[in-house]
């Protein structure tokens, strides 16, 4: 169950995910899967460098920045290409006010 969930506007986001006391970078999408004619609101998170089965575990999502709005793609290849670009942005994202 989604307890105490506050979701941002539809789109693709850079996120940090806390699981079991550890933080991981990832990207998440909120919205309807319009490329595949989806009409239900969905939340999906991709945690980078992470391969554990955590279904049923509690996680915390920290919404860091919006990458883009949800887009309907003409085909799966276009979607995959965009997701690869989104991942590149999310992996190397740093806060604007970070002086390091």
Predicted features and spans:
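Phosphate/ribose-recognition catalytic cores of enzymes acting on nucleotide-derived substrates
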Residues: 1-100
């Amino acid at each position: 169950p989604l307890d105490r969930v506050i979701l941002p506007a539809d789109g693709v986001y850079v996120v940090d995910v806390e699981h079991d006391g550890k933080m991981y970078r990832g990207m998440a999408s909120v919205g309807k899967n319009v490329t595949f004619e989806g009409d239900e609101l969905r939340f999906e998170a991709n945690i980078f460098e992470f391969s554990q089965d955590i279904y049923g575990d509690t996680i915390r999502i920290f919404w860091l920045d919006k990458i883009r709005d949800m887009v309907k793609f003409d085909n799966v290849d276009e979607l995959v290409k965009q997701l690869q670009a989104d991942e590149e942005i999310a992996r190397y994202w740093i806060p604007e006010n970070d002086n390091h």
